[in-house]
């Protein structure tokens, strides 16, 4: 079930140390109101009021979103503060003070106080990109100098209400393909950068948090300072064997120098509902459907008599004639979640700090609450100026996650779907545990079979030291960092197997008569499992950047790193050995007057996955750029076209996570070999020893050759357009040989670096922001990504028919029959190519592609697309008028297909009680009076022909979704001041509110044939 947030209650308050009792009580009262944000206002003492005033306000970005972390400096007194997470600030200054507002990537804003106590600020992006900073691999670069394909997600656009950060990505950034496969609350999304480029073991991007490889979903959205996606070779080659699938870079929040302590708190209550709850056939629909299918097989005889149907429907004897809506009995229509986040940030000349704690709880979707999870977490980021140019950084975090589920959580869903409404009561009226003759009772699975508890703990630490050598060599810095991360997982399963019964009738006294169908036990059986690992990482680097003659800008990076990961609970001796990587990386950049740009990157990396002579690889990239808008001749039209930059890159990147059936594929492994003996012991022959797995001393990493061509355009300092074309050829994909001649004498096929694949496409982003007047502001943004991949080689034997070959087609291309409609007469069946099984009138008819008179797997052809969308897009807007604001965002996917079928579409051939189907199927299956029905004939047996993958049961899973929407109103300042607070904002917001799709049975984003 996809979840959506229909209503949410938030409360934010800052600087609470000076609150009066009255103000505290007021905040507690307001915290019970929905969608309310509150910030407390300090009460200055009497002596301060005589010489100073308290100035406060809110800082917004170009999208009219709150901008946290903005530095506010009182120029005369040098006092400083920073904005909280909702962009609010408060500072006590002289009435004639001058305030300077600054933030990375935005123009400095200097205002005179002139006795004003309320000063709202709108920050504008740098009209020139000369000073804007972008996070790149192992550092930062000036935005103007960046010629790699890098996409950033503004912090204000990150939905802080999500529990898994991966669920934020869909439709938000050009080049990102993200889908949420599971509908279970609390689950994350799968995502790829520019789609899938390999059919090898690892196609997921590298995720780095503060430069350390970590799980994206462990990052609290509240803690994020910057979020960037690195897409092309120039941006990722520096990561060598880890960068082939793209890189996600996240930096976490830090304290600001010159800021007094600011305490921010956020509490949130959310109501979550499924985007689409499946509708199954009710009792009457099922019995009518089953009677038709039964009569079709039994020469007109019906299974349910009119008298029996009446008893099931009128409820006269619910023990023997039950009528249960299992979806309503097992699942709730909605559930809730709660979140609390508190952080403290500040800084002085010596120390800057950011400390945060959070708690998230999500209640279950079952009746009653049988499944829930909670997730307390903490983080801290401390910068200490040991000396004038020496900074020590300490970054600590811990995430603890607990999930509680029914014991049979996986099978509960399908049993709830498939169990027919008239199969069995939840329990018999005398309390006897009920179970059908075949299958199980969903109520028992939820309430009587035990439970699972899953505990996960992630402890992460990072310590770094930065030395600035600029007093001696301008622009030179050194950095060293070390991290230690520990992951621990525990699973406790307490299962129970109760004795169950099935009522067969009533005796003369009217009491139920039972047959015992399961001899169970009344005690809990304990099963437990533990997993864990620890990871260390060491990095040392030198960076340099300087400007010569006000024209030549030169930069460089040289870095060494090493990483080791050890399994705490290995399954074998081989798995107990640490996983190790090490290497060096470098970057050289040059620009002339910010017009012409050249950049080179390299990674020289080693992995112990490979043989000693093949462990290290060199991965270079090069890029050029030309910002024509900085030419002198461009000046006359610079007010129209303010930025125009062309860029191109090419490089080679690696992937050492190649998979295979063994860890050290370069080593041969010996095994017992049947077929010959090596002596005897006690009269019993001893098997000989031979090569079980042949070693491959040439095993190596995958190589990705990437090319990117892009253009950046900005018009009238308000409309930005970025477009990139990309092409990638992946080679050396580690795959099992398709066939090895028997004369070679090996028991298994070896793995070799043989596979090849191509991926290409285009991604683009558009932004527009405009302040129309003092009352109206508008911002619009959108992005689009298209990619298509295809297999070039996979070492499989050539198909017996060219149309069956997977080479030249997308990875995981769907195959099936071409459906020609339904058989309408017996003569049509007799005069058609032989179909699957024994088709009947109303069954599907398939095309005989090869013309041999038989429809079989030789007639499979490529149909539709794949389950991963080729088209991904998103667009939205923020509009504000005075104290009112509206925001919305749409997300969509296209060129994606899937098959429907299985137990929720086709009735069971073996278990009548496990034969329920979707209501849409029950109302739209083929009958003589419905010759053009949506679904083929339903049958209690002999319908194999209708279950094969084909164009008939393949569906278009494209959709467009209203991903988020919010309407807000901010009370006037005068009203707030009378209440003793600085800001009150009422709003209504929601997530996943509307979905537009041709597919109606369930949420089209769910990758499942049954729902």
Which residues does each PLM region occupy?
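Short, small/polar-rich motifs associated with maturation and membrane association
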Residues: 2-378, 391-393, 776, 850
